[in-house]
Amino acid sequence: MARGAGLVFFVGVWVVSCLAAAPRTSWKRVTSGEDVVLLPAPAERTRAHKLLWAAEPLDACGPLRPSWVALWPPRRVLETVVDAACMRAPEPLAIAYSPPFPAGDEGLYSELAWRDRVAVVNESLVIYGALETDSGLYTLSVVGLSDEARQVASVVLVVEPAPVPTPTPDDYDEEDDAGVTNARRSAFPPQPPPRRPPVAPPTHPRVIPEVSHVRGVTVHMETLEAILFAPGETFGTNVSIHAIAHDDGPYAMDVVWMRFDVPSSCADMRIYEACLYHPQLPECLSPADAPCAVSSWAYRLAVRSYAGCSRTTPPPRCFAEARMEPVPGLAWLASTVNLEFQHASPQHAGLYLCVVYVDDHIHAWGHMTISTAAQYRNAVVEQHLPQRQPEPVEPTRPHVRAPHPAPSARGPLRLGAVLGAALLLAALGLSAWACMTCWRRRSWRAVKSRASATGPTYIRVADSELYADWSSDSEGERDGSLWQDPPERPDSPSTNGSGFEILSPTAPSVYPHSEGRKSRRPLTTFGSGSPGRRHSQASYPSVLW
């Protein structure tokens, strides 16, 4: 059912106090079948007036769970929120006149009731034999002769079913001699359950159950469940945390604040306690009522960490460090674990969780709804896991044969992509091969040209005079000279040479300006570094071209 913000009915003193300036709303719980006395007339009132009792039934809204709400300036009241869709229109129940109102035939009447089992007794509303359908909001209004009607009191009546009596052994007969068992009911008529005295509301906020250990740390936390504010107010939370160590071991404590948005479509927010301890469960990650469920969280709004704590140095006396997300108008309240809202706006409204970790384990937690009156929603704590959101299933038509799947258009595209990739790789391979071939050719040419440029250069045509100094008339000597090293010359240069031969002309050269040059210069070899390998060119008879 879609629920809007305008379909939410608020029950509590904050509605009456802020909107109608009336006294607080009270709560009354009775058992089915009891006689209930509600809303006595106020003691201080004008003489001429009439009293009007009315009711707004809430029996179709399920169980009502009131919560303690703090108003600013500090004040605590019980309140709850119900969906207007489950409510029926207000109904007048009874009216009383003071002095009595004149009726026809010169008669007077002072009370008038429009419903069975309802009467006015001593200017109080009485419901005889209350039923579960009588649960609702009851109001009393006073109307003066010259004033408009004003509401002076209201009460939320919750009628619970009567407990079923359990049978006792006295209600049955023992087995007789024939083995026949005759059960008989008690002859006494059932007695109505004893009337319970009214229970006053607690004077302190609800205490979150703490974690107790024989060893380790016990944490106590106290907090209000809701704070209502008007836009522009500055206020702070009121969380009290006490850590008691049972041994001398050191420990670390983290106080973590988390915030959750409260959608206007939710009549209440459900906090699944099991998900606080196991937030990674599938039911907690995907609850069926995700918008209105608190089962997992993405980030921490504020963290105050205490390190090096012990029995003798409990928080906040141990080393503390605080971190907070940058939220305008939100800050730490001094050096405590509480938050301060400065010039609060509707954007600050939401459901806040305060969780205490001791050595990375949850030891205590509490929740708090901080909002304006128009944004307020109930916060209900559930002990069980939420229902998991069902997986989406594609709808199928029954008794209809599914058509053959059409050929996918992605097939040709994939084939074209594969062929294109193959052609591209082939082109890259050919290009690489061509580049390598060209590079190798250029390298070979460069080496060849370098070798030809550094080779020996001959400046004379070989003739018979070139070998005159080493020629011999004996054929045998000429033949043997091929296998012997030439003798060392006195004018030989140093053994460190380049290995090339310098040919000097010993006869008239074939080039100009060489006539008359009769000096015979020996052919000198600049040795390669080893005297044994140094030799002259004449040692090897050959023809130089």
UniProtKB/Swiss-Prot annotation:
Segments on the Virion surface face: 21-414
Disordered as annotated region, ranges: 162-206, 386-408, 470-545
Leader peptide range in chain numbering: 1-20
Span list, region Fc-binding: 230-375
Stored InterPro entries: Herpes_gE_N, Herpes_glycopE_Fc, Ig-like_dom_sf, Ig-like_fold
UniProt motif (Internalization motif) ranges: 458-461, 467-470
Entry-listed glycosylation sites: 122, 238
Functional summary from the UniProt entry: In epithelial cells, the heterodimer gE/gI is required for the cell-to-cell spread of the virus, by sorting nascent virions to cell junctions. Once the virus reaches the cell junctions, virus particles can spread to adjacent cells extremely rapidly through interactions with cellular receptors that accumulate at these junctions. Implicated in basolateral spread in polarized cells. In neuronal cells, gE/gI is essential for the anterograde spread of the infection throughout the host nervous system. The heterodimer gE/gI serves as a receptor for the Fc part of host IgG. Dissociation of gE/gI from IgG occurs at acidic pH. May thus be involved in anti-HSV antibodies bipolar bridging, followed by intracellular endocytosis and degradation, thereby interfering with host IgG-mediated immune responses.
Protein name, entry field: Envelope glycoprotein E
